[in-house]
Amino acid sequence: MAVSSGNSSVNSSKKLFSGKKGQSIGIVRSMNYKIPGTFGLESGKTLSGVRVEYEMYGKMNADKSNVILICHALTGDAHAAGFHEGDKKPGWWEIVIGPNKAFDTEKYCVICSNILGGCKGSTGPSSIDPETGKHYGISFPVITVKDMVNAQKKLIEHLGVKQLFAVAGGSMGGMQVLQWTVSYPEMVRKAIAIATTASTTPQQIAFGAIGRKAITDDPKWNGGDYYGKEIPSQGLALARMIGHITYLSDASMQNKFGRLQQDTDKSGIKGTTGTEGKNSSEISSEISSISSEISSELSYDFTPNFQVESYLNYKGDNFTKRFDANSYLYITKAVDYFDLAKNGSLIEGFSGVTAKYLVISISSDWLYPPYQSQEIVSALTANGVDARYEEIRSQHGHDAFLLEEGQLSYLLRSFLSHILVSDVMNRNFYTVSRDETIEHSSKLMVKECVSHLPVISEDGKLEGIVTSWDITKAVACKINELDEIITRDVKYVYEDEKIEHASSIMEKHSISALPVIDSEHRIIGIVTSESISALFGKYD
């Protein structure tokens, strides 16, 4: 295993992350949420009755602070892990989601939803327009990645989650991660963007345009009105074949196929259905099936001679059985429109981001090359954002984020487990000044349900702390002035210190809360044993 950049040590992974081997989450079920009222789009148009398909793995803790949102790629869906009843194959990111895996469902509640515009349960062009009673087709309004994120936000709010512990995704899923932190910075603590870009390039737009033209030039597309009729399978299959080439690398194609020829005498030419949206074991078995029939004879006609041809043909054909052609048009268009630069500056575009970032590239990815991930990190760090860059060394190309279990798991675990005080502290807190009365402080504690009140000076600097126990003693001793009961030798922490340090101080001094201060001794938050337990109570 090799990982470049960052401060992580791959060789130490066994020491850092020992324990049980990851297991499947088991049987899961899909759920569907209907957004009430109308849903506004970036284009200015609206949709009614928007539905969002989603799956949830693991349980939310008491204050719902352990939720991780997974964003899927172009043709993925909400089924990221586990098995549906009767299925033999698990979700598309099974390698990292489940008990004792990187996204540990014993610790986190993991949610994945199908994007707006998709065809796997969420509202898209194949859905029924409530105004006409017919399929939307191309009357469905053009959407953007921002629209997708806005729909996800509606779901997250519906579930009662105020802040996501993390948002993660690869490829177009990575675009959604970036958009989340730009649109809703206060709602995301940690962001994991894998094999993605902050601004779609001309080459990437070109591949999308060719794929769309393959679909719209298919006579059976019929202007997008093919529902209940024969689908534009030829165009959709060709679009998928074109797209899938960009997911592989030259080295991976050489290793998988070389110039091996296909035995065309067989009644069926073996092939695979493509990797995106599939788990690693399924991908491996499909590729192996290609190698089972090899010929050294050239056909001297236009039937597929080479195994790579068979692979792409069957990949395209099988894709038409699970995906809607119009959805492909809309989603690739949304990818084309994606550009987080503001006034031509990505630094300006990221100016409001506050989440801690892990940006991962893949060494052999030529669809979203490493330099694009490096540009993201540079723009983030220019804004003072804590952003870490890592590169997965792999010959699998863009698809490596679905295949490289070892490297990916190490990076994810390392990033998620590196918890600082700033990740847990409460930035909405109440304070008092030392000239306040006991009565005022007591009423404030009762009203706001808090047991600790930091005492601050006029310029916001920490002077001490008062607890509910101090108030109780003051009442018993008939003390009226707050200044008489303040603890002045108060323990505190800084926001960039590890949460383990805060926890050890609490344990050593038998206290349940610590003020968080900045370099000028001004209070900026408070961390409590309750908040630590709420997020990490299941960790051991």
Swiss-Prot record:
One of its GO terms (cellular component) is cytoplasm. Pathway: Amino-acid biosynthesis; L-methionine biosynthesis via de novo pathway; O-acetyl-L-homoserine from L-homoserine: step 1/1. It is found in: Cytoplasm. The active site is at residues 171, 365, 398. One of its GO terms (molecular function) is homoserine O-acetyltransferase activity. Belongs to the AB hydrolase superfamily. MetX family. This is Homoserine O-acetyltransferase. The lineage of its organism: Archaea, Methanobacteriati, Methanobacteriota, Stenosarchaea group, Methanomicrobia.
